[in-house]
Amino acid sequence: MKLLSYLDNGAVQPGLYVDGDVYGLSSLCNSIRDMLDQHGSSLGFIEKAHADGNLPLVGNFDNLHIKPPLSPRKLLSVAGNFVAHIEEGGGKLQPEHTQAPWIFCVPPTKLMVGHREEIQLIPESRKIDYEGELAVVMGRTAKKVSANEAANYVAGYTIYNDVSERTPFMIEHVNEPRQLSFWYTKSFDTFGPTGPFLTTADEIADPQDLTIRVEVSGEERQNCSTQQMIFTVYQLIEFLTKFLTLEPGDIITTGTPAGVGSTTGKFLQAGDTVRISIDNLGTLENPVVRT
C-alpha cells in the first residue's frame, strides 16, 4: 500500500495511491502521521475502505500537487553508512565505523518539499550536493527494541534526498574559526525532499535488498544496493532506541552510497532535475532553481 499527502485548496490532505490514481483519506484521518498515531502499523482498514468503494477519487497522481508523505516529530540521519561512500571521500573503513553509527539530527520543522517541488538555491548556496537515501518511517512507539524485533515497529519506507551544502562555512567562535555542523549545512529550506509515497512495510520483503539509483539531468550518479550498508535498518533502530524513544511517524534516513558531487565535483546547478528511484518505493523527482 502506498500512502501520500497532497495539496488541496491550500490544505495538506492524506491520500491512497492505487494504479496512478489518488483516493482521499480525510474521512479516516487528518494526516498520515495522525493515522500512524492512532493505528500504528495496522493499516488494513484503509485497503478495506478502498475495496468497499468508500474512498473518493481525488484525481490522477500526475495532476496533483504532491507534498512529503508526513511531517515527522524527529528526523534522524546516519552519516558514513556505506563503505564506498567513506572511501570515495578519501577515508578507509576503520574499526570505529562498525562499532556505532554516526547519527545527526536535522530540524523536522524545516521547510521540507515533496515530489516535483523545487530545491531552491539561495545566493549563499555554492556547492549543493545530492544524496539519495532510503528512509524508514516508524509505526509504533519504540524503546530498547532489538534488531530482531525492529521490523514490528516499522510502518514503511520512503525516499529521501539529503541535499547538502558542501562549502566549509566558517564562523568566528571565541577568536577561533569553527566549521558549521551538519545541522546547518543540511537544513536549508527545501533541502531534504521526501516521498513521493510512504510504502507500507508489508510491500518490502527485505529493506537490505533494494537498489538506490540517482540521476541528475539524465546522468546516472549513484547506483548501489542497500546490502552495502554498514548498519542495517534494524540495527539502526536497535541503536537509536537504546537512548531515545522513537514515535510513530519519526523518520530515520539511512545514509547514501558512493557517487555524490563532493567527490565527483558535479554539484547541483539551476536547471538540473534530480531523480531518485528505489525498488518498490517509486521515484522522487525535484527540479533545482536559483532564487
Q: What do the predicted segments below correspond to?
A:
Residues 6, 16-18, 25, 105, ...:
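Short beta-strand-to-turn element immediately C-terminal to the catalytic PLP-Schiff-base lysine
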Residues 109-168:
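Non-heme Fe(II) oxygenase catalytic core, chiefly the N-lobe of the double-stranded beta-helix
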Residues 1-101, 273-277:
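N-terminal non-catalytic cap/leader segment that marks the start of a structured domain
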Residues 7, 77-78, 105, 129-139, ...:
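Short beta-strand segments
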Residues 8-9, 45-50, 59-65, 69, ...:
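Catalytic-pocket segment enriched in acidic/His residues
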Residues 4, 65-67, 91-94, 119-128, ...:
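A generic local secondary-structure boundary/capping motif
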